UniProtKB/Swiss-Prot annotation:
It comes from the Bacteria. The keyword Cell wall biogenesis/degradation does not apply. One of its GO terms (cellular component) is plasma membrane. This is ATP synthase subunit delta. PANTHER family: ATP SYNTHASE DELTA CHAIN. It comes from Clostridium botulinum (strain Langeland / NCTC 10281 / Type F). F(1)F(0) ATP synthase produces ATP from ADP in the presence of a proton or sodium gradient. F-type ATPases consist of two structural domains, F(1) containing the extramembraneous catalytic core and F(0) containing the membrane proton channel, linked together by a central stalk and a peripheral stalk. During catalysis, ATP synthesis in the catalytic domain of F(1) is coupled via a rotary mechanism of the central stalk subunits to proton translocation. Belongs to the ATPase delta chain family. GO terms for molecular function: proton-transporting ATP synthase activity, rotational mechanism. F-type ATPases have 2 components, F(1) - the catalytic core - and F(0) - the membrane proton channel. F(1) has five subunits: alpha(3), beta(3), gamma(1), delta(1), epsilon(1). F(0) has three main subunits: a(1), b(2) and c(10-14). The alpha and beta chains form an alternating ring which encloses part of the gamma chain. F(1) is attached to F(0) by a central stalk formed by the gamma and epsilon chains, while a peripheral stalk is formed by the delta and b chains. It holds the Pfam family OSCP. InterPro entries: ATP_synth_OSCP/delta_N_sf, ATPase_OSCP/d_CS, ATPase_OSCP/dsu. It is a peripheral membrane protein. The gene is atpH.
Length: 179
């Protein structure tokens, strides 16, 4: 249920951003606000504190962000405080990023390897994924020593798992079944 709400909030803000030709600015500002909330224990305590009323929380946010973000973003943040959804701002940001990718015929691909991909490997992977999904690929690379070797790719709900750790687990399962 909340994913649906996150999507609705994100879509509403995206439409406002699009009308004002400020999609990139809004995404950047929201990322900054999310980072500030995540990295500030004081702000988290204020937002979670049951004895600090909604009006005071809104005043604090207005003081913090009035000259740092667009007025429409500030209004959005205040609505989230009013609806007690501000602690879920990151989910709304992620939904807004998804909407941005969808509207621009792009898709995000998360790639895990033990060592960084070479330039040629990265380009080939982007090309193959682009052909498969018929979209521009935004590659997010991650180094993960636990996969031992190979490559793990997640695009949306699709997973391509060519990791050594998964192969070893599969072999172990096969051997245990035989016993």
């Amino acid at each position: 249920m909340y994913e649906y709400l996150d999507r609705r909030y994100a879509l509403a803000l995206y439409e406002v951003a699009e009308e004002n030709n400020k999609v990139d600015e809004y995404l950047r500002d929201l990322k900054e606000v999310v980072n500030i909330i995540k990295n500030s224990e004081d702000i988290c305590k204020i937002l979670k504190h049951p004895e600090i009323n909604t009006s005071r929380k809104k005043e604090i946010f207005t003081e913090l962000f009035k000259d740092k973000v667009d007025d429409k973003i500030l209004s959005f943040l205040l609505v989230l405080i009013e609806k007690d959804r501000i602690l879920y701002l990151e989910e709304k940001l992620k939904e807004m990023e998804k909407i941005y990718l969808e509207k621009n015929n792009m898709i995000s691909a998360n790639v895990k390897t033990v060592i960084p991909l070479l330039k040629e490997e990265r380009e080939e992977l982007i090309e193959k994924l682009g052909n498969k999904y018929n979209k521009k690929i935004i590659l997010e690379e991650e180094i993960d020593k636990s996969i031992i070797g190979g490559v793990y790719v997640r695009v949306g709900d699709d997973v391509l798992d060519g990791t050594l750790s998964t192969r070893l687990k599969d072999i172990k399962k096969m051997m245990l079944k035989r016993e």
